[in-house]
Amino acid sequence: MPLYSDARSLQRICGQRLKGFEKQKKEAINERSEKKKMHAVKSMEKRFQREDENMTEMPETEDAIYFKLGDENSEIPAGKTVIEYSLDKLWTPDGSRILAQNIFLRIRGEEKICIIGSNGSGKTTLLKKISEELLQRKDIHAEYMPQNYEEILELEKTPVDFLDTTGYQEDRTKIRTYLGSLKYTASEMEHPVRELSGGQKAKVLLLKLSLSKANVLILDEPTRNFSPLSGPVIRQMLKEFRGAVISISHDRKYIDEVCDKVYRMTEAGLILERENS
């Protein structure tokens, strides 16, 4: 007796087997597809791991930007009066109103002071007036870092040309080395200053302060455009500086770690708010 009694039974069985084969084929394809997906996921995971490792290493490379402010000649004797500044009335730059009265500020030796106060109270206006007096003095070497960097930066020059005051190749090489330590690329060193970010401009001015060997620094929001990774380095540099610092800041860490005295700007003048021991 034949295995299959009729053609219809044979067709039905063949159809079932064909469906089973197609199902197995589809499962095999899906399995290969899943393996490919898993492989892609694992590859992506490894790539993210490598990126994470690189990111965790960033603070170490950022810490390496350290360089000193001033030199052995920047130290100011403890008893030397850096400034004894008096002003009856502080006017707005346009002369339309009085911001404060009876201002008095005395700084001696290596004192580092910070002026705080509300926006519009006249802090920057006062600091500019103080800088005008100190920058003219011959018995000290003062440098000023304004809140608006463009007041000092020559925007069409490259960072190297702006910082180069001698034209000697040796000095230009040193400037490039310092800029490299501040994470400037060779290309960025040749860009006009106007194309730089706020943080890059701040680094140029910080390097200018260092190269100048000044012993009095006048700083308006000195930590404002530096990254959180650079902040501790900048604060340490200013803390170790052997000269005097007159500054404005809203940065609590800077005030606590760097400044010896904190003055509040009021309509009645400068009020000593606290002395850090």
Where are these regions (language model features)?
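Coupling and communication elements adjacent to P-loop NTPase active sites across diverse families
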Residues: M1-S96, R108
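ABC ATP-binding cassette signature C-motif
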Residues: M1, E75-S277
